[in-house]
């Protein structure tokens, strides 16, 4: 009688955790392999793929129609003086407003600047 993969998986699914551990140990002994090495390689690759960006930069791409409102929004968000905020806004496109901030902070800053009429990117 030939057993297919699906039948084996069904049988393993009904086993307790301890039974599965014993099965793995028996398979390692019988075939002379180690499941730990394969698991470590698979887990290492998965960890790299799962890494998520945690720090974001907010970049002013365009000022829009209401330059004064954008300067006020930049001033409020960055704590810069009027002249520094004006110079920063006028350096758009690609004026980095804040670097290395959380996603929530970046989204909030983007929203406030877009409400003022600016075009903003989060990188």
From Swiss-Prot:
The record's Gene Ontology cellular component field reads:
cytosolic large ribosomal subunit
Keyword set for this entry?
Ribonucleoprotein, Ribosomal protein
Q: Name one GO molecular function term.
A: structural constituent of ribosome
> Which domain of life does the protein's organism represent?
Bacteria
A single GO BP term for this record reads: translation
Q: HAMAP family of this UniProt entry?
A: Ribosomal_bL12
> What does it do?
Forms part of the ribosomal stalk which helps the ribosome interact with GTP-bound translation factors. Is thus essential for accurate translation.
UniProt similarity note: Belongs to the bacterial ribosomal protein bL12 family.
Q: Outline the subunit composition.
A: Homodimer. Part of the ribosomal stalk of the 50S ribosomal subunit. Forms a multimeric L10(L12)X complex, where L10 forms an elongated spine to which 2 to 4 L12 dimers bind in a sequential fashion. Binds GTP-bound translation factors.
What name is this protein filed under?
Large ribosomal subunit protein bL12
Q: Which organism is it from?
A: Photorhabdus laumondii subsp. laumondii (strain DSM 15139 / CIP 105565 / TT01) (Photorhabdus luminescens subsp. laumondii)
């Amino acid at each position: 009688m030939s057993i297919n993969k699906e039948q084996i998986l069904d049988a393993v699914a009904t086993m307790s955790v301890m039974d599965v551990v014993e099965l793995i140990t028996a398979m390692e002994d019988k075939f002379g392999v180690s499941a730990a090495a394969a698991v470590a390689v698979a887990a290492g690759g998965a960890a790299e793929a799962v890494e998520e960006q945690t720090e974001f930069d907010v970049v002013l791409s365009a000022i829009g129609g209401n330059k004064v409102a954008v300067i006020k929004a930049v001033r409020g968000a960055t704590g810069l003086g009027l002249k520094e905020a004006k110079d920063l806004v006028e350096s758009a496109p690609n004026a980095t407003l804040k670097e290395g901030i959380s996603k929530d902070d970046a989204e909030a800053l983007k929203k406030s600047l877009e409400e003022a009429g600016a075009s903003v990117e989060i990188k």
